[in-house]
Amino acid sequence: MSAPGRVWRNLPAKAKAKVGAVLFGLFLLAAVIGPQVMPYDPSYANPDPSLLMARPSAQHLLGTTQTGQDVLSQLLVGIRLTIELALLVGVIATAAAVLVGVTSAFLGGFWDEFLSLVSNVFLVIPALPLLILLLGYLPQRGQLPTIIVLSVLGWPWGARVVRAQTLMIRNRDFIAAARESGERGWRIIAFDIIPNEVSLIAASFVNTVLYAIGASVALAFVGLTDLNSWSLGTILYWAQGQQALQLGAWWWFVPPGVAVALIGTSLVLLNTGIDELGSPRLRATRGAARIAGRRVWPTDPTPVLAQLTASRGRLGGFLHSFSRGSLLDETTPAGGELR
Amino acid sequence: MSEPIVGGLPASGLPVTGEPAADASAAPAVNADAEQVGEPAAVTSAAAARGPLIMEAVALNKVFQLGRGASLQAVRNVSFGLYQGAVVALVGESGSGKSTVAKLLAGQERPTSGQVMLRGKPADVRRGRAFRRYKATVQYVFQDPFSSLNPVHTVGYQLSRPVKLHQAGVRDVRAAVTALLEQVRLTPAGQYLAKYPHELSGGQRQRVSFARALAAQPAVLLADEPVSMLDVSIRLEMLNLLDDLRARLSLALLYITHDIASARYFADEVLVMYGGQLVERGPAEEVTQRPAHPYTQLLIASAPDPDNLGSALKGGSASQSRASQSRASQSRAGNVGPAPAGCPFSSRCPLADDKCRRENPALQPLSPARAAACWRLDAAVPPPVASPR
Amino acid sequence: MSPVLDISGLSVAYRAPGGDVRAVKHVSLTLNAGEVVGLCGESGSGKSTLAYGATRLLRPPAVVTGGSVRYGGRRVTAGGDPVDLLTMSHRELHQMRWREISIVFQSAMNALNPVLRVQDQLLDAIRAHLPLSRGQAREKAATLLDLVGIPRGRLRSYPHELSGGMRQRVMIAMALAADPEVVIMDEPTTALDVVVQRDILAQIVELKETLGFAVLFITHDLSLLLELADRIAVMYAGRLLETGSAQAIMREPAHPYTRGLLNSFPSLSGPRRELAGIPGSPPDLRDPGPGCPFIPRCGHAVAACGELDMSLAPVTSGLPPGPVSHLTACPIVATQVSQEGVLS
């Protein structure tokens, strides 16, 4: 495995999740206060010719567009709009996915067949072309239609995953025991099954948000959303339309592009952390452990303390003996023998 | 000195056949056409001495459809009663249908034919309110303490639910839950309320399962292998607890197990199941001391008995190698044919003759309290039981 | 004759953020060629940790913190000194595995790969350790199934098509693939019915007589060991409490825990008597308390028990001394035994 690969594998889940959370938190902060603190109205086109497609300066920290609009302001509004849309789609689609997935697995029989059929059909439809078609035909182009369309196409994957998990849980004894106690069906679903799926639902939510960001940026880039609102994709649309790349106006398309990439990355990191936190088994088999200061892989034979410390040398052993939980203070045994 | 136990059957008196050929499938598929010949003998249950009849299984049959036209008769013509304050043990190997019987009695499955009677009236276990009312009288305890408790809820919450559902109008739920924990000897009860299942040992979890069943204040407790998954050293304590609960709460207890020794220790009446049928029934002491059916004899001979430890497992003897040869030849034949049309045990039984393979016997009476389903009862000489050292 | 496996003062711990869990504490055990040694203990007693730690199969965060595990099989030592598994490299251990020491794992249901046929799994084991061609390996797999009494036709079956007893036999066949000297059996019959269990045990004895390997049989069911084993070691909370021949343990249990265990089995042929079992539950290994770990559950405990160093001492008894020494960690019961003579 390559060095970066090894490093990635070994980072503990908590670190990944923390980095992801902090990064996403920053963007969330930007989304909330950004539009309040932005220096200019993003749509304001400054007619001053020296400020057309101008490089970043003290006045315009990220430069200006072809029509003299401030890129930084657009970026801040864009972050808010994009995150807003993505979170809304995440909530709606995940709620739908959980509802459909748990119900179909719990009820079984006809309902399971029917709901599975519905989710499979939606899964199979190629999403982007359908999105383009729908949005192309809808009279409005604003945020709302985009949210609706993305939610409608974004729930089936989560539904399938939740259904699979629910099928497994449904066969566990404690569900039958809840029935034995006389619990009603809906209470079993709400209080016995779903609490066991929290980390799955959280991961599914994050996944959906990620998908929504990607899809909305793609749609905006293609010009299918409201071009009067400044989402990140719209900025890129205009930048592309005005030949920003060819003209070398990197300050116009790099910031929104990087923002999209970073938001996506932060979500992926968050998700990895959730996966491993939710499944202790993943944690245990993850990678090497450190024992007595040395790295031990799961496929190595059980380490023997004497061997580990012997190869460290005296100074290392001396220093290590101060670490907490040191096993070096094992006293001579007085054990018996089976002869 | 006891008979050397060779290959699972006593070396004398019965031909040594050793390894049963029917080792291929865990559930001996019973031929659905193998109807029992004759009516099962009416027997006075040894448990009836303890108290009135509370629950009765009447000619229960359960056939599972396996898809592609195949079906599995898991339970055939099983009838018995549960009496207040008495323990009835249902003994059999995996695949014998004993768990299915319990599920039929619990209302988790519906019989294909036959009836479950509760206090003289047919049990009404349709969904909804009727089912919940049934649950207030008949409770089922699960086998696996590691999966019968919800891992995300505390013990206190999981016990409070059945209390609220069944003890309507109880003011202090916490006090009721504490009382339940004390009943199952989880004390001091207060410290268990906030614990999660993974913080408890197997034995403690199983006690919580008992407490949950008792919250409904049932009259009948169906315990499906309640101690099989616990360590040997705590099994006895749990059985003693069950016995104590039975006595104090006047429960009718159905104890399902594959361990016939614990059935002898604990039960009033023992019912032995094989291949979905009852093959023997009678008072616990008599069935275990003088087993009449060849399968019961096999069970008794195979069980490790601390008072009667045969030395046959250690040290090769001539009879040992003879047994192993015949065992090997038996198993080489494998078991890939359709189930026998007659007695389900006939493919493994050393006494089986043509009648056994053709006709499936119903329970034949042996005494007012005993019966066994076998055509060869006269020839099935029980192995001499050694006196303790 | 020197023992084929000599575990001496072995200690194994699991590193955990809250402090180390000492799962095995200074346990010594020997296995002579061709004998069956039973290791008895509840869940959490450390019996599996002992076996897997000795063969270095435990994954991190487990560490072997002390002791030695000397293997004296003739193929490896060539008549010389035994080799210590704890000092071997990964490569040397790989040579040892399966050819010298093999393991029949608990719960064959889970140990067999559900998506591979029996033949493929046997071939895996065979070709990993023996230099055979595919054809030779296939023939060997068939021979192994013959050995354990499974029809050859079953080679093409998947594990779920076999019964529990047959799956366990496949595991045994796999363990014998490279003709080892020592076979460690970890609760091989736990999930099986009594009838199948007895057949498997008889099969094991027969194979042992034929092929001549030694068996370390791990279980929580003492009654099995009393029938099957030559010598028995009783473990509790990571320590050995009592060791001796099966006869001695059965007739003169010299530790309150062993007595409690023997008193936990309802008898089939003896009189129907009231049994007490052992109250309480095993201690938390993170904080077992000083002295003997059995104190909270012991009816004979006195203040001095809290200061025991848990070394094993011979039992003075009314029985004539046999070739196998009978040792116990409980000084109180040892004296009782000598006073009371043979117990029933």
What are these regions (language model features)?
Chain A
Residues 80-96, 186-218:
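Transmembrane alpha-helices
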Residues 4-8, 64, 72, 76, ...:
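Alpha-helical membrane-protein architecture signal
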Residues 1-94, 98, 102-103, 110-113, ...:
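Gly/Trp-centered helix-boundary motif
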Residues 22-25, 76, 88-95, 118, ...:
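Hydrophobic residues within alpha-helical transmembrane segments
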Residues 61, 95-96, 105-172, 200-202:
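Generic hydrophobic transmembrane alpha-helix motif, especially the helices
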Residues 27, 102, 132, 136, ...:
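Transmembrane alpha-helix boundary and packing residues in multipass membrane permease domains
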Residues 123, 136-138, 166, 207-208, ...:
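Glycine-rich helix-loop "coupling/hinge" segments at transmembrane-helix boundaries
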